[in-house]
Amino acid sequence: MTIIRKKHPLIKIINHSFIDLPTPSNISSWWNFGSLLGLCLIIQILTGLFLAMHYTSDTTTAFSSVAHICRDVNYGWLIRYMHANGASMFFICLFLHVGRGVYYGSYNMIETWNMGIMLLFTVMATAFMGYVLPWGQMSFWGATVITNLLSAIPYIGSTLVEWIWGGFSVDKATLTRFFAFHFILPFIITALVLVHLLFLHETGSNNPTGLNSDADKIPFHPYYTIKDFLGILILLMASMILTLFFPDILGDPDNFTPANPLNTPPHIKPEWYFLFAYAILRSIPNKLGGVLALILSILILAFMPLLHTSKQRALTFRPITQIMYWTLVADLLILTWIGGQPVEYPFITIGQTASIAYFAIILIFMPITGMIENNILDLD
């Protein structure tokens, strides 16, 4: 068996990636989220595949086809709710994975980090298009509002929006193409994940100290396969509790009403995992400025390696920057809350303050605290 594992051209790749992979001996549970994201992706592809067998991407039948899946298809309700809540679990793992990367300075592995940012954008696009497919009120109006933001692009904006819509409004053509893209993108994501892993295995994993761990590596299997398995069990248990006991808790009640272009919901808002970015978008009165801030709220991650001023990699031994980091986390939670609130006083002011704080912490305060810590520890 050992000979096959190490010699066979295909099994050899799996062996080097998941079995004999030299891994730092001290990586904590924060390093579990990579494998959990892989599991989420597999669950989403499988449940999505079965949903696609029964779903129809036509404006007249899309809503009723989802109802048909829940009522008439064997375990259709389970597949549908696993897919919908699976997206939420996916984003929880994604945010924790990115947060871990920021905390422990993993962004210094630039190729892996940039690949991760590309993955984040692709997953967000996929989730957005998936939200449109049930063709409820929030699906329709969410699609209308978000796609309409592209009209802010100078000169080509209006033409671009009509091109994406396939007409003069969100309609049958839009739904059909969104379904096509939503179906194909997870497979593109899978390919990007392989490239992400390829880059990661070029440098090896980071670890909680942020120090070079070449002197202390252990094989991935059995030590981290068993650790990942525990994480997988916890994730599956959490997913099942969410799916079986609270299936609609993260959804919007407006989506139980079929899409009606003549009736606008009182508060148009996206799924919870986009609310922080939506709050940043809304906090800027200018349309183009809002769109740029929306894109920058994620793209700012790409500037992290350039903004790293500390002589240490991780925040493990940097208490001042730790305060900044946890303030940033609190700020993101505030933005998420504000994104779900109506556009009125005091929410507008809170949203604008939190948006300024978000960019200020990343662009100004964290680099400054890094330099202060260098001076305190005399690392210059």
Curated annotation (Swiss-Prot):
Keyword Transport found: yes
Residues spanning the membrane: 33-53, 77-98, 113-133, 178-198, 226-246, 288-308, 320-340, 347-367
Subunit structure: The cytochrome bc1 complex contains 11 subunits: 3 respiratory subunits (MT-CYB, CYC1 and UQCRFS1), 2 core proteins (UQCRC1 and UQCRC2) and 6 low-molecular weight proteins (UQCRH/QCR6, UQCRB/QCR7, UQCRQ/QCR8, UQCR10/QCR9, UQCR11/QCR10 and a cleavage product of UQCRFS1). This cytochrome bc1 complex then forms a dimer.
Binding locations of a ubiquinone: 201
Known function: Component of the ubiquinol-cytochrome c reductase complex (complex III or cytochrome b-c1 complex) that is part of the mitochondrial respiratory chain. The b-c1 complex mediates electron transfer from ubiquinol to cytochrome c. Contributes to the generation of a proton gradient across the mitochondrial membrane that is then used for ATP synthesis.
PROSITE patterns per UniProt: CYTB_CTER (PS51003), CYTB_NTER (PS51002)
Comment on bound cofactor: Binds 2 heme b groups non-covalently.
Binding site for heme b b562: 83, 182
Similarity section: Belongs to the cytochrome b family.
Organism taxonomic ancestry: Eukaryota, Metazoa, Chordata, Craniata, Vertebrata
Gene3D superfamilies (alphabetical): Cytochrome Bc1 Complex, Chain C
Xref: InterPro entries: Cyt_b/b6_C, Cyt_b/b6_C_sf, Cyt_b/b6_N, Cytb/b6-like_sf, Cytochrome_b, Cytochrome_b_C_euk/bac, Cytochrome_b_N_euk/bac, Di-haem_cyt_TM
Additional information: Heme 1 (or BL or b562) is low-potential and absorbs at about 562 nm, and heme 2 (or BH or b566) is high-potential and absorbs at about 566 nm.
Main location as per UniProt: mitochondrion
Stored Pfam families: Cytochrom_B_C, Cytochrome_B
Residue pairs linked by disulfide bridges in the UniProt entry: none
Recorded GO MF terms: metal ion binding; ubiquinol-cytochrome-c reductase activity
SUPFAM superfamilies: a domain/subunit of cytochrome bc1 complex (Ubiquinol-cytochrome c reductase) (SSF81648), Transmembrane di-heme cytochromes (SSF81342)
Gene Ontology biological process terms, A to Z: mitochondrial electron transport, ubiquinol to cytochrome c
Residues that, per the record, bind heme b b566: 97, 196
Keywords: Electron transport, Heme, Iron, Membrane, Metal-binding, Mitochondrion, Mitochondrion inner membrane, Respiratory chain, Transmembrane, Transmembrane helix, Transport, Ubiquinone
Membrane topology: Multi-pass membrane protein
Any one annotated GO CC term: mitochondrial inner membrane
Cofactors required: heme b
Keyword Transport: yes
Protein name: Cytochrome b
Compartment list: Mitochondrion inner membrane
